[in-house]
């Protein structure tokens, strides 16, 4: 009996302890949730101030220099592992649908040669151009090891090498379009590509996609406008979706925005698709 009574007493004591512990635990959890929300808000605000300051102050050429520094130092984009990896799944399906095998393709922003190599392996006559000297050199080393000619040439940022209309299709390298600052430069870039292609040629563009009215994009945009006014910074217009991410300029788009820029450059939109946060569009030259 004594043992039974002691057990009941201990159980009651443990129950009281548990009941006293639960409110304290709940209080700590609530405190954590509150602190975490405010920490994240402060982080977003600090990030918006940082991105907005530089977006409002740096002009398009300076943003290009920031982006170039990122890609010039990239070991990933220069690596044989990346450049010999072939097409992404979405690239393969789009190319099979809109591009005729055996046709002549120009790749803009060809990097270390991934798209050019994959296209040539798939039976296309492909060549490209790139503005990063280290990436062009990396492509030359890869082509040399494969016993191939050097199919990637150097070109200035946001420019297209001049020449005759000889290409049957155009490919803007993986997310290259998303790193070109200002709508005017992007449209001029597309027009330059159009001038190298035969009428009716397909164009593939990939980019970072966004939904309209994303709060972080709006916050960064407003902050950039404030700093531009305060510092009398860049003269080019600022756009919602302009960001600085991983030490490079990044522009994210809605499909409607991409379609409008293609139309301004003389392409009609033929197909939209998405792969996670990546969007891609096929335009047809008119």
Predicted segments with their positions:
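Class I SAM-dependent methyltransferase SAM/SAH-binding core
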Residues: 112-159
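A short glycine-rich, Lys/Arg-flanked "PGG" loop and its adjoining helix->strand segment in the class I
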Residues: 187-199
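SAM-dependent methyltransferase
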Residues: 205-261
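Conserved class I S-adenosyl-L-methionine
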Residues: 25-100, 102-111
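Core SAM-dependent methyltransferase catalytic element
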Residues: 271-286
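A short acidic, Gly/Pro-enriched loop at the edge of an enzyme's catalytic core
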Residues: 161-170
